[in-house]
């Protein structure tokens, strides 16, 4: 069965809480700087079709500094300096595959185009104020997103880095999907279990086992 995001989420966008989120953002943008730009909030959904999802990497909320957030977890536009967490992701990627690849930018759109759904739990943030939009209803929406992936997809690999992401584990049926957990790649926690997790090679092994094309993580 081929499903689109519209098929599985159209009713959600009609619900009162979702309408309230959109109204709130419209008002906030009149007086404050909100990231990402309105056009980029749902980029993860535009770049990875529901039918193509093979992997989910769950982030927290968007980057809260100018020009960084563009709707994909951990990713930044090509012209922006690579943030510390993403540098650590690249470091683990090289270690995992025993490479010394030089990454010239932090845009992960090529991952998204290969079926890696780069979702944040919270989809917007006020400039300079991390987690400022954590209570406006986004968690209801992203819980629903994870739930429909769990319900309608098979053998998806969920990469949950850090305790916030791991709280979503209860939404997933482990009989039908795979969950890989590690510490968050932030410099504050990467040495507590993110480095050495080998999630990228493990993910590809699972994809091969389930007869899916592995991700070319170095295609950036």
UniProtKB/Swiss-Prot annotation:
Q: Which Pfam families match?
A: UDG
What PROSITE patterns does this protein's entry cite?
A: U_DNA_GLYCOSYLASE
Presence of the UniProt keyword Transmembrane helix in the record: no
The catalytic residues are 61 (proton acceptor)
Which InterPro entries does this chain map to?
UDG_fam1, Ura-DNA_Glyclase_AS, Uracil-DNA_glycosylase-like, Uracil-DNA_glycosylase-like_sf
For this UniProt record, the keywords arranged alphabetically read as follows:
Cytoplasm, DNA damage, DNA repair, Hydrolase
- Catalytic activity, EC: 3.2.2.27
Alphabetically, the GO molecular function entries are: uracil DNA N-glycosylase activity
Q: Does the keyword DNA damage apply?
A: yes
Question: GO biological process: what's one of them?
Answer: base-excision repair, AP site formation via deaminated base removal
**Transmembrane segment boundaries:** none
Catalysis performed (reactions)? Hydrolyzes single-stranded DNA or mismatched double-stranded DNA and polynucleotides, releasing free uracil
- GO cellular-component terms in the record? cytoplasm
Superkingdom classification of source: Bacteria
> Where is it located?
Cytoplasm
The record's principal subcellular location, in a coarse class, is cytoplasm
The protein's matches in HAMAP family, at most eight in alphabetical order, are given as: UDG
For this chain, the family text in UniProt reads:
Belongs to the uracil-DNA glycosylase (UDG) superfamily. UNG family.
Task: Give the function comment from the record.
Answer: Excises uracil residues from the DNA which can arise as a result of misincorporation of dUMP residues by DNA polymerase or due to deamination of cytosine.
Q: Protein name, please? A: Uracil-DNA glycosylase
What is the phylogenetic placement of the source species in the record? Answer: Bacteria, Pseudomonadati, Pseudomonadota, Gammaproteobacteria, Enterobacterales
